[in-house]
Amino acid sequence: MFLLELIKGIILGIVEGLTEFAPVSSTGHMILVDDMWLKSTNFLGSQSAFTFKVVIQLGSVFAAAWVFRERFLEILHIGQHKPEPSTSGDRRSKPRRLNLIHVLVGMVPAGILGFLFDDLIEKYLFSVPTVLIGLFIGAIYMIIADKYSKTVQHPQTVDQINYFQAFVIGISQAIAMWPGFSRSGSTISTGVLMKLNHKAASDFTFIMSVPIMLAASGLSLLKHYEYIHLAHIPFYILGFLAAFIVGLIAIKTFLHLINKVKLVPFAIYRIVLVIFIAILYFGFGIGKGI
């Protein structure tokens, strides 16, 4: 039984690492896994399972922090980083550089919304039906953004983002607190609609997400610290490591491919997932009444 629980923990860490920064909604996937699998197997008990999911999310966050470590050091004026060259062809303009203010401006909307409504969001939106709605609406938004990207040029790199763009992208991050909508799907789509290329929008999304996710995860652990048990430490360690290692691979692969594959393939996956889960949930009652 102990070995089986460890395997479940590793699987959850892999799912978290694969989905946290892909535009498919890791929270949505974890809720689906929770409602349609974990609750039926009573993995660690409901409250301890929640803290486990927070811990493995930290694994993915630390993976993103590692991938962008040079950027964070430069933003904090600890390291040196040359801004990406402009592709606009204007050599007279002095290149901008992404700085701490951009990150803070992008964090403000989600920070305020999370502080005010975190408990309500967790109470009313963390269910299979609401996740399916978020997955579907988010997929449509991503398709619209990709269609728009084919009709305009996207010359801006991440170092050319201005404060207004950072704030608007931050608003879309706040909207993505609806489980299933997807933080990266929402913010990358908004960045593309604001004339960033897909890679630049992805870079800013990941950089902006790390501090706010660290804060949110830390707050969740403080609120539920009584459910952290020494007996569960092996699960936390293995789940964290699985999420961290898989997250590193997933993030690097995603950033390498995003300008080529765009967002539509992820949107199609989301729509197919919605149909599949809806059939299981509404047609066969799997995940209901657990």
From Swiss-Prot:
Disulfide bonds: none annotated. Its main location: membrane. The chain crosses the membrane at residues 1-21, 48-68, 101-121, 125-145, 161-181, 202-222, 231-251, 266-286. It is an enzyme of class 3 (hydrolase). Its EC number is 3.6.1.27. GO terms for cellular component: plasma membrane. One of its GO terms (biological process) is regulation of cell shape. Pfam families: BacA (PF02673). GO terms for molecular function: undecaprenyl-diphosphatase activity. The keyword Ribonucleoprotein does not apply. Keywords: Antibiotic resistance, Cell membrane, Cell shape, Cell wall biogenesis/degradation, Hydrolase, Membrane, Peptidoglycan synthesis, Transmembrane, Transmembrane helix. It is a multi-pass membrane protein. It is found in: Cell membrane. The keyword Membrane applies. It catalyses: di-trans,octa-cis-undecaprenyl diphosphate + H2O = di-trans,octa-cis-undecaprenyl phosphate + phosphate + H(+). Bacitracin is thought to be involved in the inhibition of peptidoglycan synthesis by sequestering undecaprenyl diphosphate, thereby reducing the pool of lipid carrier available. Catalyzes the dephosphorylation of undecaprenyl diphosphate (UPP). Confers resistance to bacitracin. HAMAP family: Undec_diphosphatase (MF_01006). This is Undecaprenyl-diphosphatase. The gene is uppP.
